[in-house]
Amino acid sequence: MSEIRKNDHRLMQVLLAPVISEKATLVADKNEQVVFEVAPDATKQEVKAAVELLFKVEVNSVNVLVSKGKAKRFGRFMGKRKDVKKAYVCLKPGQEINFEAEAK
């Protein structure tokens, strides 16, 4: 863990954006989890360290998934949307991340 903390510049690049969707809000209310879009090469340990550093909360666990991009047609050519890596961050009881307050 101390090796990861040394490289704060890398931790700033791990979290790309919070995922704001219906499923993400249900998970946040029910399980005290927050969903982030993360860098494709990010590890669970890096995500945990980045969330603890940026939001000053304690993280219980991290689950990650890679959502494959859809094949889409652009005129007569076939293309593909980018793959997205998401991290479901489970916070310890009593911890909360409020994005509205963070933005102000």
Curated annotation (Swiss-Prot):
Key words of the record: Ribonucleoprotein, Ribosomal protein, RNA-binding, rRNA-binding
GO molecular function, one term: structural constituent of ribosome
SUPFAM superfamilies: Ribosomal proteins S24e, L23 and L15e (SSF54189)
GO cellular component: ribonucleoprotein complex; ribosome
InterPro entries for the chain: Nucleotide-bd_a/b_plait_sf (IPR012677), Ribosomal_uL23-like (IPR013025), Ribosomal_uL23/eL15/eS24_sf (IPR012678)
UniProt entry tagged with the keyword Ribonucleoprotein: yes
UniProt record, GO biological process: translation
Top-level taxon of the source organism: Bacteria
Entry's family note: Belongs to the universal ribosomal protein uL23 family.
Subunit organization: Part of the 50S ribosomal subunit. Contacts protein L29, and trigger factor when it is bound to the ribosome.
Known function: One of the early assembly proteins it binds 23S rRNA. One of the proteins that surrounds the polypeptide exit tunnel on the outside of the ribosome. Forms the main docking site for trigger factor binding to the ribosome.
Protein's name according to its UniProt entry: Large ribosomal subunit protein uL23
Organism: Paraburkholderia xenovorans (strain LB400)
Gene behind the chain: rplW
